[in-house]
Amino acid sequence: MATLRADEISNIIRERIEQYNREVKIVNTGTVLQVGDGIARIHGLDEVMAGELVEFEEKTVGIALNLESNNVGVVLMGDGLMIQEGSSVKATGRIAQIPVSEDYLGRVINALAKPIDGRGEISASESRLIESPAPGIISRRSVYEPMQTGLIAIDAMIPIGRGQRELIIGDRQTGKTAVATDTILNQKGQNVICVYVAIGQKASSVAQVVTTFQEQGVMEYTIVVAETADAPATLQYLAPYTGAALAEYFMYRERHTLIIYDDLSKQAQAYRQMSLLLRRPPGREAYPGDVFYLHSRLLERAAKLSSRLGEGSMTALPIVETQSGDVSAYIPTNVISITDGQIFLSADLFNSGIRPAINVGISVSRVGSAAQIKAMKQVAGKLKLELAQFAELEAFAQFASDLDKATQNQLARGQRLRELLKQSQAAPLTVEEQVVTIYTGTNGYLDSLEIGQVKKFLVQLRTYLKSSKPQFQEIISSTKTFTEEAEVLLKEAIQEQMERFLLQEQT
């Protein structure tokens, strides 16, 4: 048996004494009084900040939301099934933040920016606060560049600009998500980073959206943030802020970003659940008093930055679900008053086969034609006017039996214009194609066709124009104007294609 000599023992003790480093660590701790329903009440934690992250003994993390005189109300960012009454909790000294980097592009993540697509970790050197202040007045400039959605009804009559916030509102199953996802598909090749935030949706719906993005090849410039219906309320409440933090990261790096919140009604419901469990006083529809601030501080982060900050932009398309078309409910009116306009989707139009089911009469963009190229302004003004007159006449024509020829012609034109606004899902059109379509309709070239032939003719016309008159597209994309030369080319193409089409139909 080996024996230790006295001098060896003294050397070991001497080394230990020399290596001893006295370090005092002050940790702010507390004790769990009560836990359940995703909420924990903590005694102690005297110096905790509002919104600070706290860590439980079994490593669950929570956010301190209610700072009361004798306890702290914490919402859990996990199920917290292993937390026990009497266990200790420590304050971390950090406000909620997430890592950010270019590597997030093409990934599906949760509200804590952790990947959930099974493709391994994401490397990130920087981090951003989930809740950051919105850009101030001096940091912004007015919206002037178009954010093309690829949908004629929107780009012509309810134009969206880069840095705008445009609400998409409507009942369930009216195509709200389809409008938003088509807008993402249309950003292909436009150098726009897209963030799609899914809040409280079915996992199957989110999977369907991600599959569409992958098939269409748009995942390379898109980040999907998903918290499904079975996620804790805290994470559903945080998901939009996580998406905003990622979009901001790119915006401040002089890039253009588009963020979709699908949908904010679910976020408000998650926040209502948390607030009621924290015993905050309920207000209208049992929502807490600060539910307006919940959405305003999120949507104000969308901006068009000034030239001094690099002219980056963040365009927000929040989605809100209504109950049987009631836009005067609490959350819809709140979000309408925060955003720069709304696109109203109607269940009646959807069921009658008009898709996208946009009710042009009550939809509005408060940025207006500032967010359109000159060519679009030139052709879209007439379209708006004719559709408005058609809507008026249509209501009147239901009661009048004998209509004069002019009124009949106007009704026929209106029906064809309504037909040209119809589009299939995942088939966005370029601006040049939209200008062609609108010009053909408003100048009466479709009047001689049957309503059922309109769509087929327009598809063939766009293909024919691309192959036989490529200079038309060059003129519009380079000058952004519908010049006389472009008009001559278009008229020729319409006449040539009309002759071919009518011959085709006869045979």
From Swiss-Prot:
<keyword id="KW-0067">ATP-binding</keyword>
<keyword id="KW-0472">Membrane</keyword>
<comment type="subunit">
    <text>F-type ATPases have 2 components, CF(1) - the catalytic core - and CF(0) - the membrane proton channel. CF(1) has five subunits: alpha(3), beta(3), gamma(1), delta(1), epsilon(1). CF(0) has four main subunits: a, b, b' and c.</text>
</comment>
<keyword id="KW-0793">Thylakoid</keyword>
<dbReference type="GO" id="GO:0046933">
    <property type="term" value="F:proton-transporting ATP synthase activity, rotational mechanism"/>
</dbReference>
<dbReference type="Pfam" id="PF00306">
    <property type="entry name" value="ATP-synt_ab_C"/>
</dbReference>
<keyword id="KW-0139">CF(1)</keyword>
<dbReference type="GO" id="GO:0043531">
    <property type="term" value="F:ADP binding"/>
</dbReference>
<dbReference type="InterPro" id="IPR038376">
    <property type="entry name" value="ATP_synth_asu_C_sf"/>
</dbReference>
<protein>
    <recommendedName>
        <fullName>ATP synthase subunit alpha, chloroplastic</fullName>
        <ecNumber>7.1.2.2</ecNumber>
    </recommendedName>
</protein>
<dbReference type="InterPro" id="IPR036121">
    <property type="entry name" value="ATPase_F1/V1/A1_a/bsu_N_sf"/>
</dbReference>
<dbReference type="InterPro" id="IPR000793">
    <property type="entry name" value="ATP_synth_asu_C"/>
</dbReference>
<dbReference type="GO" id="GO:0009535">
    <property type="term" value="C:chloroplast thylakoid membrane"/>
</dbReference>
<keyword id="KW-0406">Ion transport</keyword>
<keyword id="KW-0375">Hydrogen ion transport</keyword>
<keyword id="KW-0813">Transport</keyword>
<dbReference type="GO" id="GO:0045259">
    <property type="term" value="C:proton-transporting ATP synthase complex"/>
</dbReference>
<feature type="site" description="Required for activity">
    <location>
        <position position="363"/>
    </location>
</feature>
<dbReference type="Pfam" id="PF02874">
    <property type="entry name" value="ATP-synt_ab_N"/>
</dbReference>
<feature type="binding site">
    <location>
        <begin position="170"/>
        <end position="177"/>
    </location>
    <ligand>
        <name>ATP</name>
    </ligand>
</feature>
<dbReference type="InterPro" id="IPR023366">
    <property type="entry name" value="ATP_synth_asu-like_sf"/>
</dbReference>
<dbReference type="InterPro" id="IPR000194">
    <property type="entry name" value="ATPase_F1/V1/A1_a/bsu_nucl-bd"/>
</dbReference>
<keyword id="KW-0547">Nucleotide-binding</keyword>
<keyword id="KW-0066">ATP synthesis</keyword>
<keyword id="KW-0934">Plastid</keyword>
<dbReference type="InterPro" id="IPR005294">
    <property type="entry name" value="ATP_synth_F1_asu"/>
</dbReference>
<keyword id="KW-1278">Translocase</keyword>
<dbReference type="InterPro" id="IPR027417">
    <property type="entry name" value="P-loop_NTPase"/>
</dbReference>
<dbReference type="InterPro" id="IPR033732">
    <property type="entry name" value="ATP_synth_F1_a_nt-bd_dom"/>
</dbReference>
<dbReference type="InterPro" id="IPR004100">
    <property type="entry name" value="ATPase_F1/V1/A1_a/bsu_N"/>
</dbReference>
<dbReference type="InterPro" id="IPR020003">
    <property type="entry name" value="ATPase_a/bsu_AS"/>
</dbReference>
<keyword id="KW-0150">Chloroplast</keyword>
<dbReference type="Pfam" id="PF00006">
    <property type="entry name" value="ATP-synt_ab"/>
</dbReference>
<comment type="function">
    <text>Produces ATP from ADP in the presence of a proton gradient across the membrane. The alpha chain is a regulatory subunit.</text>
</comment>
<dbReference type="GO" id="GO:0005524">
    <property type="term" value="F:ATP binding"/>
</dbReference>
<comment type="similarity">
    <text>Belongs to the ATPase alpha/beta chains family.</text>
</comment>
